[in-house]
C-alpha cells in the first residue's frame, strides 16, 4: 500500500509539473524564471512526495530487517546497507519535519492570498461534498464520498486555523505538524482515486481496487483523527468556534471497516 501511494503521488506531481512547464514560451527572456515559478507552485505536492516516499521506504526496509533477523545488522547482507542508507532519506533534501513546515506554510500562504478560495469552497460544500459525483467511480461510491468529505474537512480546519490564529498559525509546531499530516492523508486519497480512473486494463484495476480501498480507509481515519486533534486544541486555546460538529457528522455519514476492502 505505502509503495503504491508513493508511486501515485510522484507520478501525479511530476506529471503536473511537466504539463505546467510545457505551456511556457521557451523563447521568453524570463523562461527559466517562469519554470522556477512552476516548480515552486508545486512546493506542497513535492514536500508530500518526499515525506510519503521516504517513510514508505523506511517501513519496507524496517520490515526487511525484521525478516532477516539478527543477520539484518551484518554487513555481509544487503539489508544492512539498505537500513543505513534509508535512514538518511528522512534527513537530507529537507528533513521530513521541515517539509511539514513547508506543507502547512504554503497552504496558509495560498489561503491568505486567496489562491485557495476556502470560504467560497466551504459555502459550496454544505453537503460535505457527498453529492459531488465528479470523483465517483462504480464500486467506489463510499470511498469517493470519503475523499470529498475529507476535502471539506481540510478546508474547514484551515479556515478555523486562520480565523483563530491568522499568520501566527505557522509558529505553532503542534498545529503545523498535524495539519501537514492531514493534507498529506487527503492528498494520498485524492491522488489514488484519480490514478485508478486512468487504469484501463481490467485485471490491473481488479488487483488495484483492494489497495486503493485500504489506502482510503487508513487515510480517511487519519484525516478524522488529526482534524479532531486540531479542533480540540483550538477550543482549548482560543474562543473560536471549530468545525468539530462537522467532523462528527462526516464520520457518521461514512463508516469504513476492513471487511469492505475485499
Task: Mark where each language-model region is.
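Flavin-dependent oxidoreductase catalytic core characteristic
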Residues: 1-262
Amino acid at each position: 500500500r505505502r509503495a503504491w501511494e508513493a508511486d501515485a503521488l510522484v507520478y501525479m506531481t511530476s506529471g503536473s509539473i511537466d504539463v505546467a512547464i510545457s505551456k511556457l514560451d521557451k523563447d521568453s527572456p524570463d523562461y527559466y524564471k517562469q519554470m522556477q515559478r512552476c516548480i515552486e507552485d508545486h512546493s506542497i505536492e513535492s514536500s508530500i512526495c518526499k515525506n510519503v516516499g521516504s517513510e514508505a521506504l523506511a517501513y519496507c526496509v524496517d520490515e526487511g530487517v525484521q525478516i532477516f533477523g539478527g543477520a539484518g545488522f551484518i554487513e555481509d547482507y544487503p539489508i544492512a546497507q539498505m537500513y543505513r542508507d534509508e535512514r538518511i532519506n528522512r534527513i537530507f533534501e529537507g528533513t521530513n519535519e521541515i517539509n511539514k513546515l513547508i506543507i502547512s506554510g504554503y497552504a496558509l500562504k495560498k489561503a491568505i492570498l486567496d489562491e485557495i478560495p476556502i470560504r467560497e469552497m466551504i459555502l459550496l460544500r454544505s453537503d460535505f461534498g457527498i453529492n459531488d459525483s465528479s470523483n465517483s467511480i462504480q464500486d467506489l461510491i463510499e470511498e469517493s464520498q470519503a475523499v470529498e468529505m475529507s476535502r471539506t474537512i481540510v478546508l474547514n480546519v484551515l479556515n478555523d486555523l486562520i480565523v483563530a490564529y491568522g499568520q501566527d498559525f505557522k509558529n505553532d509546531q503542534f498545529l503545523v505538524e498535524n495539519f501537514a499530516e492531514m493534507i498529506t492523508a487527503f492528498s494520498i486519497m485524492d491522488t489514488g482515486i484519480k490514478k485508478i480512473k486512468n487504469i484501463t486494463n481490467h485485471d490491473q484495476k481488479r488487483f488495484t481496487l483492494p489497495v486503493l480501498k485500504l489506502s482510503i480507509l487508513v487515510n480517511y481515519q487519519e484525516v478524522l483523527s488529526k482534524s479532531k486533534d486540531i479542533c480540540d486544541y483550538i477550543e482549548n486555546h482560543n474562543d473560536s468556534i471549530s468545525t468539530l460538529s462537522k467532523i462528527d457528522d462526516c464520520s457518521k455519514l461514512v463508516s469504513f471497516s476492513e471487511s469492505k476492502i475485499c
